[in-house]
Amino acid sequence: MSQHLPLVAAQPGIWMAEKLSDLPSAWSVAHYVELTGEVDAPLLARAVVAGLAQADTLRMRFTEDNGEVWQWVDDAQTFELPEIIDLRTNIDPHGTARALMQADLQQDLRVDSGKPLVFHQLIQVADNRWYWYQRYHHLLVDGFSFPAITRQIANIYCALLRGEPTPASPFTPFADVVEEYQQYRESEAWQRDAAFWAEQRRQLPPPASLSPAPLPGRSASADILRLKLEFTDGEFRQLATQLSGVQRTDLALALAALWLGRLCNRMDYAAGFIFMRRLGSAALTATGPVLNVLPLGIHIAAQETLPQLATRLAAQLKKMRRHQRYDAEQIVRDSGRAAGEEPLFGPVLNIKVFDYQLDIPGVQAQTHPLATGPVNDLELALFPDEHGDLSIEILANKQRYDEPTLIQHAERLKMLIAQFAADPALLCGDVDIMLPGEYAQLAQINATQIEIPETTLSALVAEQAAKTPDAPALADARYQFSYREMREQVVALANLLRERGVKPGDSVAVALPRSVFLTLALHAIVEAGAAWLPLDTGYPDDRLKMMLEDARPSLLITTDDQLPRFADVPDLTRLCYNAPLTPQGSAPLQLSQPHHTAYIIFTSGSTGRPKGVMVGQTAIVNRLLWMQNHYPLTGEDVVAQKTPCSFDVSVWEFFWPFIAGAKLVMAEPEAHRDPLAMQQFFAEYGVTTTHFVPSMLAAFVASLTPQTARQNCSTLKQVFCSGEALPADLCREWQQLTGAPLHNLYGPTEAAVDVSWYPAFGEELAEVRGSSVPIGYPVWNTGLRILDAMMHPVPPGVAGGLYFTRIQLAQGYLGRPDLTASRFIADPFAPGERMYRTGDVARWLDNGAVE
C-alpha cells in the first residue's frame, strides 16, 4: 500500500465543507468538451484510460481515523474504458446528452458515497460531433489541473492516432506536493506569510455583495447561474490600445473591481482572488487541488483614473503573490474565528490564462463548464484573449441571484467599458452605471407634484368645524366634545396663551398626560400662531430640562402634579391646564401663517445629544392632505390617539381626524403598552383607524385569538405602521387574524412625519420577497433619492444612501445651524432646493418602490 498522506492545501477545507453540508454532489467538478470533426471514439477511450492513470491524485483513497483524515494512492486501481453512447437517432441529441450529464451530477457523489470519484463518457450527437463528458471530485483536482488532464489525454490520443508510444506523464507525484507543503509549514517563510496575512486581515475592509441578502460564511448551494460575456465589439481592445502602458490582465481586473464596487456602492471592500499556489514548486505540475482563494482589499478612489486603479491593484497582487501559499482558512483561524463562521470576502475574481485549447488535428474542441463546486456569492473569471478582446464568465449562487438581474448587471459592465474606451482619462467616481431609461424611470417615480392650498393646520381644522359643528369630534374616558365645543375650547385656551405673552412664531412646551386636554392644548398653540414642543412626562427630569434649555419656549402648559418637576427651570412661564375653560366663541384667530414652525420634536438622542427638529406648517399640511386623499376619513371614522406625543407619528393622530370630520378618541395614559387594554379600547369606541410601531403590533397580534380578533378588532378599517422595519410575516399573521388593511409608512423625525408609503396587505404583501415590507413610494410633493458615495443616483437593485427632498423637509435643527447644514444639504439635482440625508441604506425595487 502507498504511503498515507495528510490532506494539504485546499483539501482540508473541501473535506470539512462536504462533511458539514447536506448537498450530495456540490464538490464535484465537471465539464464536457464539444468535439467537431472526425473522432476515433474507441481510440479516444483508450487515451482517456491511459491519461487518467498518469495522474496519481485520480487514484486517491480517503479515510478518517480518530478525527484525522488520510489519503493514499491506490496502486491497484484501474480505470475502465469510458462508455460510448450514440444519440444520433434521438429526437433531441443535445438535450438528451445534457440530461445524461446532469443525471450523473445529481447523484450522491460525496467522497464516501461509494460512487466513482472519476467518470468519463463519450456521447455522439451527430456524425461528426461528440460530447466528451468528464467529472471529478474536487479533492482530486482543481481548476488548473482539470484542463491539464484533459490536455494530456488529447496529447495521448494524438500520439495513438500517429501510432506513436504513449507520452510520458507530465504530472508530479502528489506526495512531493505534500512533502513540500509540510516543509513550508515548518519554515520561516510560513512565519513571514503568517505575519503578512495577519496585517492584511487587520486592514481588510468588510466583504461586499451585489445581492441584498446577507452574505453567508459558507455556501449552502451548488445551484449555479452561469453567464458568459463576450466583449468582442472592440471596445476593450480599443481601451487596452489607448492604455498601452497597462497590462490587459490588470486592466480587466480593474474594470471588474470598479464595476463591483460601484454596483455594491462600496469604494472599499474585500473580494477574493484566486492564486495558483504553484509557482516554483512541485505543485506546478501536480494534479491535486492547491488553488488558493485569498482576500484582496479593494480600495477605489473617486478621483483616480482607471490606469491608476489598475496599476495599484497590480502592485497589490504582486506583493500578495509572494505570500500566496498561506491557506485562506488559516487566515480566518489566526483571527480567532472558525473557518466558515463569517465571510472573509464577497465576490471572487479569477484571471484565467490557462490553456483551454486542445490541439487535435482535424477536430475543433470547445470546453463547456458544467460544475465548478459551490459558489458562495459570485465568481468572475476574466479571460483576456490573444486577439486583445475580453470575455468574462459569471458564476452566481442561485439562492442569491436571478438571471434577469445578472444580465442587467452585465449590461452595466459593457456600458462601463464603453465609457472608458471613449474617454480613458475618465475618473472612477464619474462613471455612470445607470442604464438608458433608468433616469426617466426614477423621474416618473418622483413625479409627485400636486398643488396644495397655502394654508395652516388651524385654518384647515376651523374650516372643517364650520362644516360639521355638531358632529362628535373628541373624547376620552371623562369628556367628549362636538366640533363646535372643541373649537370653543381651543379658541379660549389660545386667547389665554396670548394673555400670558405667547406671540406668533413662539414655541410653547406641553407636559400633559394623554387626555382631551393634550389635544386641545396642541390645537390652541397653533391657533395662537405658535409651535408646540411636546414633553413626554415619562422622560427623566434631566432630559426634560435639557429640552427646555435648548428650545427656550415662551410658556409651559402642564398639570399641578407635574409642576414641581419644572420648578428649577428659570425664566419659564407656567400654565396649569386640566379642566375645560369658559367658552369665548369659536371664531378663528387667524394668527398662524404657512411659514411658521408647527411643532418642535426632539430626536431620541440615540446618536448623541437629542436634537430639536423644527417642522413647518406647509410641510405638515402637505402630509395631512396627502393622507386624507390616500386613505380618506369620513364622519363615520373613529381614530385612536395612542402614540406618545414625543413621537411625530402622534401629529397626524392629533390633527388628521379634524380636517375630515372624523372623531378622535384618547386612550388612557400608558394604555398603548397594554395589548389587552387596547383590544378593549378598540371595541368600546369602535375604532376604525389606528397606528402601531411594528414591535407593538407584534405584541398586540400575540395577544389575539381568532375569537378576540373578531370581537375587538372588527371595526378596524385601516391600520398604519411606522417607526421600525415592518416584518412581512407579521403582516401576514395580522391579515389572517383580522383582515384589516395594513399600511407601512416611513419617515424620519426630520420630515413631516412620513415621506413614503406601501400597502402591507393583499396582493402587494403577497409579492414581498424580503423579510420586511418595503418603505414604498414618495408622498405628494416629495422626492426620494438613493445615491452612492459620490452622490450619483444608483440603479434599481443597488444599495445606496437614502435622501428625501422638497416640501416635507423639516426647517432644520433648533439652534444647530452647523448640524442643519451637514444633514440638510443642497440637492445637486434641483438647484436652490435642499435634501435630507437619512443615514439609512436603501435600494429601488423593480416596481419602483424603495426597500
For the regions a protein language model found, what residue spans apply to each?
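Flexible, P/S/T/G-rich "lid" or insertion loops adjacent to the active sites of thioester-utilizing
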Residues: 17-26, 190-246, 336, 434-439, ...
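Conserved AMP-binding/adenylation subdomain of ANL enzymes
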Residues: 611-640, 648-688
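His-Asp-centered acyl/peptidyl-transfer active-site segments
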Residues: 3, 21-28, 56-57, 113, ...
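Carrier-protein-dependent adenylate-forming modules in NRPS/ANL systems
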Residues: 1-171, 263, 294-295, 324, ...
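Non-catalytic, low-complexity flexible loops and terminal extensions
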Residues: 10, 153-224, 297, 428-431
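Gly/Ser/Thr-rich phosphate-binding loop
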Residues: 659-662, 687-691, 701-770, 774, ...
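AMP-dependent adenylate-forming
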Residues: 327, 341, 350, 358, ...
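A short, small/polar-residue-rich loop/turn motif at beta-strand boundaries
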Residues: 1-3, 37-53, 72-114, 194, ...
